[in-house]
């Protein structure tokens, strides 16, 4: 099927898997031109030539409605400035029955993580408030998705959800 990876970042966690997915139709999107330059270099080094990389905003994606079978969002939702628009665009571009897979920081799980996020990572511009709690995310998902997996490890939430 067709997959969107947003934000792709540097693809440090996905490049080896993508290398083995020869027949997959994958589009990698990121707002940061610097990240795209890095991922293109990484893909070139790994001899990956069939994955599209695009610069764009998750809150205003150029894709048609119901374009993707899978949307992967690794370490993205805590970075996006407008979480509501990001969730809305992901929902809009995912086909019915398509899967939304994500992992990201959630507030209220580990005090040390909350302190680090608020005192350091947000000030450096790497994370963007407001931050959802796991319950906030569950409420967002339950309206439109069947939640297939929902796990918290430390201050990271990992989920897999199927669009109704």
PLM-predicted stretches and their roles:
Residues 2-60:
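Class I SAM-dependent methyltransferase SAM/SAH-binding core
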Residues 101-159:
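C-terminal alpha-helical "lid/dimerization" subdomain adjacent to the S-adenosyl-L-methionine
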Residues 34, 81-85:
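Short N-terminal helix/helix-N-cap motif within the alpha/beta-hydrolase-1
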Residues 84-96:
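A short glycine-rich, Lys/Arg-flanked "PGG" loop and its adjoining helix->strand segment in the class I
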Residues 59-70:
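A short acidic, Gly/Pro-enriched loop at the edge of an enzyme's catalytic core
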Residues 2, 98-99:
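Short glycine-centered segments of the SAM/dcSAM-binding site in methyltransferase folds
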Residues 21-22, 81, 95, 142:
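Short conserved AdoMet
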Residues 70-82:
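A short SAM/SAH-binding and catalytic strip from SAM-dependent methyltransferases
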